[in-house]
Protein backbone atom coordinates (compact mmCIF):
# COMPACT_ATOMS: atom_id res chain seq x y z
CA UNK A 1 0.00 0.00 0.00
CA UNK A 2 1.38 3.41 -0.99
CA UNK A 3 1.64 6.22 1.57
CA UNK A 4 -0.83 8.35 -0.35
CA UNK A 5 -3.35 5.49 -0.15
CA UNK A 6 -3.27 5.06 3.64
CA UNK A 7 -6.83 4.66 4.98
CA UNK A 8 -6.21 6.84 8.03
CA UNK A 9 -4.80 10.26 8.83
CA UNK A 10 -2.76 11.51 11.78
CA UNK A 11 -5.79 13.51 12.87
CA UNK A 12 -7.89 10.34 13.03
CA UNK A 13 -5.18 8.56 15.04
CA UNK A 14 -5.15 11.47 17.49
CA UNK A 15 -8.92 11.22 17.84
CA UNK A 16 -8.75 7.48 18.47
CA UNK A 17 -6.09 8.00 21.12
CA UNK A 18 -8.13 10.75 22.80
CA UNK A 19 -11.19 8.48 22.99
CA UNK A 20 -9.10 5.73 24.61
CA UNK A 21 -7.49 8.18 27.03
CA UNK A 22 -10.65 10.10 27.99
CA UNK A 23 -12.96 7.06 28.01
CA UNK A 24 -15.77 8.53 25.89
CA UNK A 25 -16.49 10.35 22.66
CA UNK A 26 -17.84 13.35 24.57
CA UNK A 27 -14.76 13.86 26.74
CA UNK A 28 -12.46 13.21 23.79
CA UNK A 29 -14.26 15.94 21.82
CA UNK A 30 -13.82 18.37 24.72
CA UNK A 31 -10.10 17.62 25.06
CA UNK A 32 -9.58 18.19 21.33
CA UNK A 33 -11.81 21.29 21.21
CA UNK A 34 -14.09 19.56 18.72
CA UNK A 35 -17.79 18.74 18.71
CA UNK A 36 -18.93 15.22 19.48
CA UNK A 37 -20.64 14.82 16.07
CA UNK A 38 -17.35 15.77 14.38
CA UNK A 39 -15.52 13.13 16.42
CA UNK A 40 -18.12 10.49 15.58
CA UNK A 41 -17.99 11.35 11.87
CA UNK A 42 -14.19 10.96 11.78
CA UNK A 43 -14.39 7.52 13.43
CA UNK A 44 -17.19 6.39 11.12
CA UNK A 45 -15.18 7.52 8.09
CA UNK A 46 -12.14 5.66 9.42
CA UNK A 47 -14.13 2.45 9.98
CA UNK A 48 -15.55 2.68 6.47
CA UNK A 49 -12.10 3.05 4.90
CA UNK A 50 -10.68 0.22 7.00
CA UNK A 51 -13.79 -1.89 6.42
CA UNK A 52 -13.76 -2.98 10.06
CA UNK A 53 -15.47 -1.86 13.26
CA UNK A 54 -13.27 -0.06 15.77
CA UNK A 55 -16.01 0.24 18.39
CA UNK A 56 -18.83 -2.04 19.54
CA UNK A 57 -21.92 0.16 19.79
CA UNK A 58 -24.40 -2.57 20.84
CA UNK A 59 -24.45 -1.51 24.48
CA UNK A 60 -25.02 1.78 26.27
CA UNK A 61 -21.35 2.66 25.81
CA UNK A 62 -19.20 2.28 22.72
CA UNK A 63 -16.41 -0.18 23.55
CA UNK A 64 -13.22 -0.49 21.55
CA UNK A 65 -12.97 -3.71 19.56
CA UNK A 66 -9.87 -5.84 19.05
CA UNK A 67 -9.29 -4.04 15.76
CA UNK A 68 -9.60 -0.72 17.59
CA UNK A 69 -6.96 -1.75 20.14
CA UNK A 70 -4.67 -2.96 17.37
CA UNK A 71 -4.92 0.34 15.50
CA UNK A 72 -4.50 2.24 18.77
CA UNK A 73 -1.26 0.40 19.54
CA UNK A 74 0.28 1.12 16.17
CA UNK A 75 -1.24 4.58 16.10
CA UNK A 76 0.50 5.43 19.37
CA UNK A 77 3.82 4.40 17.80
CA UNK A 78 3.14 6.50 14.70
CA UNK A 79 2.19 9.57 16.74
CA UNK A 80 5.22 9.12 19.00
CA UNK A 81 7.52 8.97 15.97
CA UNK A 82 5.89 12.09 14.54
CA UNK A 83 6.45 13.90 17.82
CA UNK A 84 10.05 12.69 17.95
CA UNK A 85 10.62 13.91 14.41
CA UNK A 86 9.28 17.35 15.29
CA UNK A 87 11.55 17.53 18.33
CA UNK A 88 14.56 16.46 16.26
CA UNK A 89 13.89 19.16 13.69
CA UNK A 90 13.36 21.72 16.43
CA UNK A 91 16.63 20.64 18.04
CA UNK A 92 18.43 21.18 14.77
CA UNK A 93 16.96 24.65 14.46
CA UNK A 94 18.04 25.45 17.99
CA UNK A 95 21.45 23.76 17.64
CA UNK A 96 20.55 21.15 20.23
CA UNK A 97 21.52 18.24 18.01
CA UNK A 98 22.68 17.18 14.58
CA UNK A 99 26.06 16.74 12.94
CA UNK A 100 28.31 19.37 11.38
CA UNK A 101 30.93 18.06 8.93
CA UNK A 102 33.84 20.45 8.43
CA UNK A 103 36.68 20.14 5.96
CA UNK A 104 40.06 21.80 6.41
CA UNK A 105 43.39 21.97 4.65
CA UNK A 106 46.42 20.54 6.45
CA UNK A 107 47.69 23.53 8.44
CA UNK A 108 44.32 25.06 9.32
CA UNK A 109 42.94 21.63 10.16
CA UNK A 110 45.84 20.76 12.44
CA UNK A 111 46.47 24.02 14.28
CA UNK A 112 43.46 26.30 13.94
CA UNK A 113 40.30 24.23 13.63
CA UNK A 114 40.60 22.16 16.84
CA UNK A 115 40.59 25.39 18.86
CA UNK A 116 37.72 26.92 16.92
CA UNK A 117 35.71 23.72 17.14
CA UNK A 118 36.39 23.62 20.88
CA UNK A 119 34.97 27.11 21.31
CA UNK A 120 31.93 26.21 19.18
CA UNK A 121 31.30 23.03 21.18
CA UNK A 122 31.37 25.00 24.43
CA UNK A 123 28.35 26.93 23.17
CA UNK A 124 26.62 24.09 21.32
CA UNK A 125 27.63 20.84 23.06
CA UNK A 126 24.82 18.79 21.50
CA UNK A 127 26.10 19.35 17.95
CA UNK A 128 28.44 16.57 16.82
CA UNK A 129 31.35 18.00 14.82
CA UNK A 130 33.35 15.88 12.38
CA UNK A 131 36.60 17.31 10.99
CA UNK A 132 38.09 16.02 7.73
CA UNK A 133 41.68 17.18 7.10
CA UNK A 134 43.12 16.82 3.60
CA UNK A 135 44.80 18.86 0.89
CA UNK A 136 43.08 22.05 -0.26
CA UNK A 137 42.30 20.43 -3.60
CA UNK A 138 40.68 17.35 -2.09
CA UNK A 139 38.67 19.36 0.44
CA UNK A 140 37.43 21.64 -2.34
CA UNK A 141 36.13 18.62 -4.24
CA UNK A 142 34.54 17.31 -1.03
CA UNK A 143 32.59 20.58 -0.85
CA UNK A 144 31.60 20.34 -4.51
CA UNK A 145 30.36 16.77 -4.02
CA UNK A 146 28.42 17.58 -0.84
CA UNK A 147 30.58 15.38 1.40
CA UNK A 148 31.26 18.20 3.89
CA UNK A 149 29.09 21.13 4.99
CA UNK A 150 31.77 23.81 4.87
CA UNK A 151 35.54 24.00 4.67
CA UNK A 152 38.29 26.26 5.96
CA UNK A 153 41.31 26.39 3.69
CA UNK A 154 44.59 28.23 3.31
CA UNK A 155 45.26 27.66 -0.37
CA UNK A 156 43.57 28.43 -3.65
CA UNK A 157 40.47 26.56 -4.71
CA UNK A 158 41.14 24.56 -7.89
CA UNK A 159 40.47 26.73 -10.92
CA UNK A 160 37.79 24.40 -12.28
CA UNK A 161 35.75 24.80 -9.06
CA UNK A 162 36.10 28.53 -8.43
CA UNK A 163 32.94 29.46 -10.32
CA UNK A 164 30.76 26.85 -8.62
CA UNK A 165 31.78 27.39 -4.96
CA UNK A 166 31.33 30.35 -2.63
CA UNK A 167 34.72 31.53 -1.36
CA UNK A 168 34.65 33.88 1.64
CA UNK A 169 38.02 35.26 2.87
CA UNK A 170 38.16 35.79 6.63
CA UNK A 171 41.79 36.35 7.66
CA UNK A 172 45.37 36.61 6.52
CA UNK A 173 47.90 34.01 7.63
CA UNK A 174 51.58 34.92 7.72
CA UNK A 175 54.17 32.37 6.64
CA UNK A 176 57.48 32.80 8.44
CA UNK A 177 61.00 31.43 8.28
CA UNK A 178 61.87 29.15 11.21
CA UNK A 179 65.38 28.17 12.24
CA UNK A 180 67.06 25.89 14.78
CA UNK A 181 67.98 27.72 17.97
CA UNK A 182 71.62 26.83 17.27
CA UNK A 183 71.73 28.53 13.86
CA UNK A 184 73.72 31.80 13.64
CA UNK A 185 70.70 33.55 12.09
CA UNK A 186 68.68 32.66 15.20
CA UNK A 187 70.26 35.69 16.87
CA UNK A 188 68.82 38.02 14.24
CA UNK A 189 65.35 39.53 13.96
CA UNK A 190 65.57 39.71 10.17
CA UNK A 191 67.84 38.62 7.35
CA UNK A 192 68.50 39.83 3.81
CA UNK A 193 66.76 38.01 1.00
CA UNK A 194 70.14 36.96 -0.39
CA UNK A 195 70.80 35.08 2.85
CA UNK A 196 68.13 32.55 1.88
CA UNK A 197 70.53 31.00 -0.63
CA UNK A 198 72.92 30.20 2.23
CA UNK A 199 70.38 28.11 4.12
CA UNK A 200 69.57 24.42 3.97
CA UNK A 201 65.81 23.96 3.63
CA UNK A 202 63.25 21.45 4.81
CA UNK A 203 60.29 21.90 2.48
CA UNK A 204 56.76 20.70 1.93
CA UNK A 205 55.92 18.83 -1.24
CA UNK A 206 56.08 21.09 -4.30
CA UNK A 207 52.34 20.57 -4.94
CA UNK A 208 51.26 21.73 -1.47
CA UNK A 209 49.23 24.94 -1.21
CA UNK A 210 51.69 26.58 1.20
CA UNK A 211 54.69 25.78 -1.01
CA UNK A 212 52.99 27.39 -4.00
CA UNK A 213 52.24 30.58 -2.05
CA UNK A 214 55.82 30.81 -0.76
CA UNK A 215 57.39 30.26 -4.18
CA UNK A 216 55.05 32.81 -5.78
CA UNK A 217 55.75 35.60 -3.26
CA UNK A 218 59.49 34.97 -3.30
CA UNK A 219 59.51 35.06 -7.11
CA UNK A 220 57.66 38.38 -7.03
CA UNK A 221 60.53 39.70 -4.92
CA UNK A 222 63.26 38.43 -7.21
CA UNK A 223 64.06 35.23 -5.33
CA UNK A 224 64.27 31.94 -7.22
CA UNK A 225 63.32 29.19 -4.78
CA UNK A 226 64.48 26.60 -7.32
CA UNK A 227 68.02 27.59 -6.35
CA UNK A 228 67.48 26.82 -2.66
CA UNK A 229 69.38 23.95 -1.08
CA UNK A 230 66.44 21.69 -0.28
CA UNK A 231 67.77 18.91 1.93
CA UNK A 232 64.48 17.04 2.13
CA UNK A 233 60.79 17.30 1.32
CA UNK A 234 58.28 16.20 3.95
CA UNK A 235 54.51 15.90 3.82
CA UNK A 236 53.50 17.36 7.19
CA UNK A 237 54.17 20.52 9.16
CA UNK A 238 54.86 18.51 12.32
CA UNK A 239 57.64 16.53 10.66
CA UNK A 240 59.11 19.73 9.25
CA UNK A 241 59.14 21.37 12.69
CA UNK A 242 60.82 18.31 14.19
CA UNK A 243 63.46 18.36 11.45
CA UNK A 244 64.18 22.04 12.07
CA UNK A 245 64.39 21.48 15.83
CA UNK A 246 66.92 18.73 15.13
CA UNK A 247 69.12 21.20 13.27
CA UNK A 248 68.57 19.74 9.81
CA UNK A 249 67.66 23.03 8.18
CA UNK A 250 65.30 26.00 7.95
CA UNK A 251 61.70 26.05 6.75
CA UNK A 252 58.74 28.26 5.95
CA UNK A 253 55.61 27.51 7.99
CA UNK A 254 52.45 29.27 9.07
CA UNK A 255 52.90 31.36 12.20
CA UNK A 256 49.80 29.64 13.60
CA UNK A 257 51.70 26.33 13.54
CA UNK A 258 54.52 27.40 15.86
CA UNK A 259 52.78 29.08 18.79
CA UNK A 260 53.70 26.24 21.16
CA UNK A 261 57.32 26.04 19.98
CA UNK A 262 57.83 29.78 20.32
CA UNK A 263 56.37 29.72 23.81
CA UNK A 264 58.74 26.90 24.79
CA UNK A 265 61.67 28.61 23.10
CA UNK A 266 62.65 25.59 21.00
CA UNK A 267 62.44 27.35 17.63
CA UNK A 268 63.38 30.77 16.32
CA UNK A 269 61.71 32.68 13.55
CA UNK A 270 62.95 35.71 11.71
CA UNK A 271 61.69 38.04 9.04
CA UNK A 272 63.10 38.57 5.58
CA UNK A 273 63.83 42.25 5.17
CA UNK A 274 61.17 44.05 3.11
CA UNK A 275 59.33 40.80 2.37
CA UNK A 276 56.17 39.55 4.02
CA UNK A 277 54.67 36.25 2.92
CA UNK A 278 50.94 36.07 3.54
CA UNK A 279 48.10 33.95 2.29
CA UNK A 280 44.36 34.36 2.60
CA UNK A 281 42.38 31.94 4.73
CA UNK A 282 38.91 31.32 3.35
CA UNK A 283 35.65 29.57 4.13
CA UNK A 284 34.26 27.67 1.16
CA UNK A 285 30.71 26.41 0.74
CA UNK A 286 28.57 25.01 -2.03
CA UNK A 287 25.72 27.43 -2.86
CA UNK A 288 23.76 24.60 -4.46
CA UNK A 289 23.65 22.52 -1.27
CA UNK A 290 21.52 22.90 1.86
CA UNK A 291 23.33 24.79 4.63
CA UNK A 292 22.39 23.68 8.13
CA UNK A 293 21.88 26.17 10.93
CA UNK A 294 25.02 24.81 12.61
CA UNK A 295 27.07 25.40 9.46
CA UNK A 296 25.78 28.95 9.10
CA UNK A 297 26.48 29.84 12.72
CA UNK A 298 29.95 28.26 12.65
CA UNK A 299 30.80 30.32 9.55
CA UNK A 300 29.41 33.50 11.11
CA UNK A 301 31.44 32.98 14.28
CA UNK A 302 34.65 32.60 12.27
CA UNK A 303 33.89 35.75 10.29
CA UNK A 304 33.11 37.67 13.46
CA UNK A 305 36.21 36.43 15.27
CA UNK A 306 38.55 37.18 12.37
CA UNK A 307 37.05 40.40 11.08
CA UNK A 308 39.27 41.70 8.29
CA UNK A 309 37.91 45.18 8.90
CA UNK A 310 39.10 45.24 12.51
CA UNK A 311 42.75 44.42 13.29
CA UNK A 312 41.99 44.62 17.00
CA UNK A 313 39.25 42.00 16.71
CA UNK A 314 41.57 39.75 14.72
CA UNK A 315 44.38 40.17 17.25
CA UNK A 316 42.03 39.38 20.13
CA UNK A 317 40.67 36.33 18.29
CA UNK A 318 44.14 34.93 17.66
CA UNK A 319 44.97 35.42 21.32
CA UNK A 320 41.82 33.55 22.37
CA UNK A 321 42.41 30.50 20.21
CA UNK A 322 46.13 30.30 20.99
CA UNK A 323 45.40 30.24 24.70
CA UNK A 324 42.48 27.82 24.54
UniProtKB/Swiss-Prot annotation:
Keyword check for NAD: no
PANTHER family the record matches: HTH-TYPE TRANSCRIPTIONAL REGULATOR, HTH-TYPE TRANSCRIPTIONAL REGULATOR CYSL
Keyword Cell membrane included in the entry's annotation: no
Subcellular localization, as worded in the UniProt entry: Plastid, Cyanelle
Annotated HTH lysR-type domain residues: 8-65
UniProt similarity note: Belongs to the LysR transcriptional regulatory family.
Gene3D superfamilies linked to this entry: 3.40.190.290, Winged helix-like DNA-binding domain superfamily/Winged helix DNA-binding domain
Xref: InterPro entries: LysR_subst-bd, Tscrpt_reg_HTH_LysR, WH-like_DNA-bd_sf, WH_DNA-bd_sf
Origin superkingdom: Eukaryota
GO cellular component: cyanelle
Function recorded in the entry: Trans-acting transcriptional regulator of RuBisCO genes (rbcL and rbcS) expression.
Name of this chain's protein: Probable RuBisCO transcriptional regulator
Record keywords: Cyanelle, DNA-binding, Plastid, Transcription, Transcription regulation
DNA-binding region of this protein: 25-44
Originating species: Cyanophora paradoxa
Pfam families: HTH_1 (PF00126), LysR_substrate (PF03466)
Record-level Gene Ontology MF annotations: DNA-binding transcription factor activity; transcription cis-regulatory region binding
Amino acid sequence: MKVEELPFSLEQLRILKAIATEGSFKKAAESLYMTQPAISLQIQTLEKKLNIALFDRSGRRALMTEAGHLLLRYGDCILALCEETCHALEDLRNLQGGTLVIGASQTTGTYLMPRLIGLFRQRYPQVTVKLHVHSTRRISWNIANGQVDLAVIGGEVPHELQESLTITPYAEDELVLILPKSHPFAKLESIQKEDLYRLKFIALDAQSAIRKVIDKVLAQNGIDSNLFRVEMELNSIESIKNAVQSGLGAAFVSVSAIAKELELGILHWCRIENITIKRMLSIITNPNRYHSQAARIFSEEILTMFSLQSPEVKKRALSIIQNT
